[in-house]
Structures are given as C-alpha cells and as structure tokens.
Regions:
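N-terminal accessory regions of nucleic-acid-interacting proteins
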Residues: 1-10, 14, 20, 24
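Active-site-proximal helix-loop-helix substrate-binding element of RNase H-like nuclease domains
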Residues: 16, 25, 32-174
Length: 179
C-alpha cells in the first residue's frame, strides 16, 4: 500500500486454467524495484504441504486479493495481465483501479515482435538477460520446478515487469497516449 504499485505474476503447473488438475503454484509480487516476494499456493514442496489442508493457500490468496488486487488505490502491473487476471477471477478476486500491462504498453509503442518479457529484459535490462536459464531452470517442466527456484524466478519476473512497465508508461505519456 505504501508504494501504490504491485507487480504480480502467477506461476502454475502449466495445465489449462479450467481443467480439474490446474494448480497455481505461486504468486510473486514486487512493490518496488529490486525486490520481490512469492506466496506459495498449491506447490508440491513438502515445506508448504500444510497450505493444502482446508485450502489455507486459497485463504492467503483471497486475503492478498482483497488487500491489493481489489484496492483501487494500488496500481496493478503485469506482463500479459489477461493471464493473471483469469487466475484471480477463477478464485473470485476482481481487480479495481488502474492496471498497466507491460506487454500491451510495449505493443502500443512498437507493434513489431518480439513482445515477450524475456526479450524486453534482454533489450532494456541487459545485465539480467537470460535469467530464466539460471541453473538450467528453463529445462525443468513447470509442474516439477523446485519451490525456491520457482520463487526466485517469479520475483525476477515481477521485478523486471515493474521496472519495464514504469519505463514504458513514461514513454506512452511522453508520446501523448495519456497523461
């Protein structure tokens, strides 16, 4: 609530959203550049097994949703908001207030591909290029990624999304898209 921004990103087991075996594994959040936190949800790691009892993970998610996503005073930021918003809606969390989608901001400025987060990190934050390849993270299937590595990756995603979205938003304002 202090910064007024929340960059969010779900990681899942890569199953289709409306299949019975779909699981959101973590939700990562960045409130300020250079930081991040991950909320474990339905990850298989034994250290968070207690979250599955009585759907404690869902209570955590809904609490976050109420305090952040449904708070109209916090600007929500994502790279491909459609994906994250579908996850929130699945669990009856409905955003209020401003949303900045970094992918759409990039597209408005230049519709030519690539439009992906990793490509934009490589272009605008080159010191972090290839972060998804750290410890061969990208070679592990989504439903088997270790919790600690997944959280590190998710926090980098939300951190870089926040940095890039704010950078791209300034460009949109300077080009007269809005004020």
């Amino acid at each position: 609530k202090t910064t007024g921004y929340a960059s969010v990103d779900f990681e899942t087991n890569a199953k289709p959203l409306y299949n019975n075996d779909f699981k959101p594994t973590i939700l990562s959040v960045t409130f300020q550049p250079g930081s991040g936190i991950s909320i474990p949800l339905q990850h298989f790691d034994p250290s968070v097994e207690y979250l599955q009892k009585n759907n404690k993970w869902l209570r955590w998610l809904r609490y976050f949703g109420k305090e952040v996503i449904e708070n109209p005073n916090i600007v929500k930021i994502a790279w491909n908001w459609k994906f994250d918003n579908q996850n929130f809606k699945k669990y009856n969390i409905h955003h209020r207030g401003t949303v900045i989608d970094g992918m759409l901001a990039k597209y408005l400025l230049n519709e030519e591909r690539p439009n992906g987060l990793k490509d934009m990190v490589k272009k605008y934050l080159p010191e972090f290029a290839g972060y998804e390849k750290y410890d061969k993270f990208d070679s592990i299937p989504w439903d088997k990624k270790p919790l600690e590595d997944l959280c590190r990756y998710g926090c980098m995603d939300t951190d870089f999304t926040l940095r890039l979205a704010l950078f791209l938003e300034e460009k949109l304002i300077n080009k007269g898209f809005y004020n």
